Amino acid sequence: MKMNNQKNANIMIKATVLSAIILIFLCFIVIFYVAFSGDNTSEIQENGERYGTSDFYRYKDKIYVLVYGDGLLEVEGVDIPTFKVFDTEDNNGNVAYDKNRVYFGNIAVSDLDTNKLYYVGNNYYSDGTNSYFCSTSVETYEELSARSINIKNIFHFLFKTKRPQHYFYPYKKLETNKRLEKVEELKNSATDGEEVYYAGEKLVNADIYTIKTIEDALFYFADKENVYYKSKLLSFKNNGKLK
């Protein structure tokens, strides 16, 4: 009798463990489905109207933009009849505008006069007074983990909250009201005739006539005196051997 009870107990334990494994597996399937079922990127790309070669699409009287990592996100508040993208040879398909605002991805900026708006080059945009840099590479709002992304997506799916956005195109307003021109020798750089800017940040004490990229040193620049890493002025000076 005792052996039968022990045998039955072992069977119950095995059945419980097996049930738990099956339940966990089903939970993973549900989480995976919930996490990815809300993305309608493929549907919009296949059935929507793309604006040239840009990242913007029109679909069912709404405008969407491709934000890498998040898929296609709605651009809210767009005046569709006046909505335009920039027709340039640069890879700046993540920026557009209408009669009211400029859109860096799906983020609107309202202090640029779109009647005077022009593309400077090197990912800079200006109306002659206000100027912005907008990167073509996305950044995250926070340190992301698969767990945090799934939790946010599950809340969106279950409670119909606004679709969570984890990535954005970083942009920066320049501290100048002068007209900009791009710096040919430096990627992501522009000048107002006095100052040099990299990714929207001022290169302190940079000489606009001698600054250049250091060969085989990504993101490092030097003028006749100073050396920079991106927009940071480094503590050592140019010894004249940097090329």
Where are the regions a protein language model picked out?
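N-terminal Sec-pathway targeting helices
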Residues: 4-25
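Non-catalytic tandem-repeat scaffold regions and their flanking low-complexity/translocation tails
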Residues: 10, 35-243
